[in-house]
């Protein structure tokens, strides 16, 4: 039998490298790993060195010492056997730690926070996030100017504790301006200070280059309109001043302007004009002269008409119909008018006189009476008020009834006249206060004869 201990394989086997390696080889494969590493020292030799590394070192009983040297513990998980890198030290490492941001990474295209370079426009634009929205702060020629705009907006939006690109001491002067403006107004200030305006825009607020080549001033969102046109100007400064004046007039001294509002203080003072008493006095004089002239015309015209009417009433042909315009409700302002139509001579006119509302008084009652008889006035009777009878000559009744084949109705006949003038005045006053026209009804031609009334004829 072969002796296994004296076998050639056993004699050719190399001796173990160390006791620990022999023990680890006897253990399970999960506790050890075998890596073939070429020998760098001898390039010509093709010898293979087997290196066994232990993942979990055995605990040393009865002591807390290190079971393995420090370099062995450091290389537990480094299967390739490379040495650990040396930590970087120096001012560069400390600067990198101090610049670490708690609000996220900076812009990829700029070293400053909140600044981005746009290839299409060729300028540096600044943005800031507020309430989940990105707010545009303007376009600038340099990244440094855009970074300063971002810093000012960040201080306004987030306070002095905000993360900014430069030190807070550089913005001491801007802190005073921020306190007087809202967020929206301060953003407009930053945009006006930017230099990256599109074509046709101006750095002044409310100013735009018109297509005719002049500068247009306008104010937007006023009184429900989209914008209010203020005019065209030759220069930007003139248009900006026009906008400032309009803004101060509409919004007062707190309006946002392009220039210092103090330069417009003298333009909005009230002009040296007449006092209020003098203005009221002039107004009274103008109104008084107008009213006096009208009153004089009314009074003078009334007197002339009365004078002419009196003569015409006595000498005119009584067969001609008369049109009376009597309005004694305004007797305090003007006299009674009696207008006689001398040019009209129409014997076939209807007998209904154009007297629809005749308030009467005893004084005026006697002007239309002849010998005190209320029924006749020179052979011609009139319907006056509601208390006097009306009669016309039969010749006129016959002519009116057959005028052109047309039948004209006779005027109504009121109740019998009162016994005295006082009763007649009372009845007419009641009709005058009601302001209703007298009652007019159409009756047959024989109504007067059936009721016992006869027309009075003019004596020949």
UniProtKB/Swiss-Prot annotation:
Gene Ontology MF terms in the entry: DNA-binding transcription factor activity; transcription cis-regulatory region binding
Motif (EAR): 283-287
Alphabetical list of CDD domains matching this protein: AP2
SUPFAM superfamilies: DNA-binding domain (SSF54171)
Keywords: DNA-binding, Nucleus, Repeat, Transcription, Transcription regulation
Motif Nuclear localization signal: where in chain: 99-108
Tissue expression from the record: Expressed in seedlings, leaves, stems, nodes, sheaths, panicles and young spikelets. Accumulates in the spikelet abscission zone (AZ) via a positive regulation by the transcription factor SH4.
Primary localization class, coarse: nucleus
Protein's name in the database: APETALA2-like protein 5
Family: Belongs to the AP2/ERF transcription factor family. AP2 subfamily.
Knockout consequences: Several spikelet and inflorescence developmental defects, including altered florets palea and lemma structures, abnormal numbers, size, appearance, and identities of floral organs, reduced primary branches number, and longer and fewer grains associated with a loss of grain shattering. Crook-neck-like rachilla between the sterile lemmas and the rudimentary glumes in place of the spikelet abscission zone (AZ).
Pfam families assigned to the protein according to its UniProt record, in alphabetical order: AP2 (PF00847)
DNA-binding region, residue intervals: 111-167, 203-260
Biased composition (Pro residues): 410-419
GO BP term (any one): regulation of seed development
Region ranges (Disordered): 1-39, 91-111, 284-320, 410-429
Function: Transcription factor. Involved in spikelet transition and development. Prevents lemma and palea elongation as well as grain growth. Required for seed shattering through specifying abscission zone (AZ) development.
Low complexity: compositionally biased ranges: 1-12, 19-36, 420-429
GO cellular component, one term: nucleus
Record gene name: AP2-5
Subcellular location: Nucleus
Signal peptide region: none
Subunit structure: May form homodimer.
């Amino acid at each position: 039998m072969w002796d296994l201990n004296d076998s050639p394989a056993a004699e050719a086997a190399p001796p173990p490298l160390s006791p620990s390696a022999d023990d680890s080889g006897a253990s399970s494969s999960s506790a050890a790993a075998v890596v073939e590493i070429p020998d760098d020292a001898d390039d010509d030799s093709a010898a293979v060195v087997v290196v066994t590394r232990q993942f979990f070192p055995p605990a040393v009983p009865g002591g807390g010492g290190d079971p393995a040297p420090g370099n062995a513990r450091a290389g537990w998980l480094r299967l390739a056997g490379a040495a650990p890198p040396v930590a970087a030290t120096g001012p560069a490492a400390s600067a990198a730690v101090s610049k670490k941001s708690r609000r996220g990474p900076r812009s990829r295209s700029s070293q400053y926070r909140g600044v981005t370079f746009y290839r299409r426009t060729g300028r540096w634009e600044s943005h800031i996030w507020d309430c989940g929205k990105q707010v545009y702060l303007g376009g600038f020629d340099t990244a440094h100017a855009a970074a300063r705009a971002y810093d000012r907006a960040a201080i306004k939006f987030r306070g002095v504790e905000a993360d900014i690109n430069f030190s807070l001491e550089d913005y001491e002067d801007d802190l005073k301006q921020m306190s007087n403006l809202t967020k929206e107004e301060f953003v407009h200030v930053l945009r006006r200070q930017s230099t990256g305006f599109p074509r046709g825009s101006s750095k002044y607020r409310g100013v735009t280059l018109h297509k005719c080549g002049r500068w247009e001033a306008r104010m937007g969102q006023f009184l429900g309109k989209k914008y209010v046109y203020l005019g065209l100007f030759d220069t930007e400064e003139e248009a900006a001043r026009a906008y400032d004046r309009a803004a101060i007039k509409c919004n007062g001294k707190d309006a946002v302007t392009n220039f210092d509002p103090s330069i417009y203080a003298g333009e909005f003072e009230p002009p040296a004009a007449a006092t209020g008493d003098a203005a009221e006095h002039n107004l009274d004089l103008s109104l008084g002269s107008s009213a006096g002239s009208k009153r004089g015309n009314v009074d003078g015209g009334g007197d002339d008409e009365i004078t002419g009417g009196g003569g015409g009433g006595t000498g005119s042909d009584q067969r001609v119909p008369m049109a009376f315009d009597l309005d004694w409700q305004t007797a305090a302002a003007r006299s009674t008018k009696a207008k006689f139509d001398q040019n009209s001579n129409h014997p076939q006119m209807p007998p209904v006189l154009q007297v629809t509302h005749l308030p009467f008084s005893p004084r005026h009652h006697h002007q239309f009476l002849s010998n005190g008889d209320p029924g006749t006035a020179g052979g011609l009777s009139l319907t006056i008020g509601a208390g006097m009878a009306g009669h016309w000559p039969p010749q006129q009744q016959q002519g009116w009834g057959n005028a052109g084949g047309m039948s004209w109705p006779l005027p109504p006949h009121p109740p019998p006249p009162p016994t005295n003038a006082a009763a007649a005045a009372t009845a007419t006053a009641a009709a005058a206060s009601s302001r209703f026209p007298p009652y007019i009804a159409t009756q047959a031609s024989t109504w007067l004869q059936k009721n016992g009334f006869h027309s009075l004829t003019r004596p020949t």
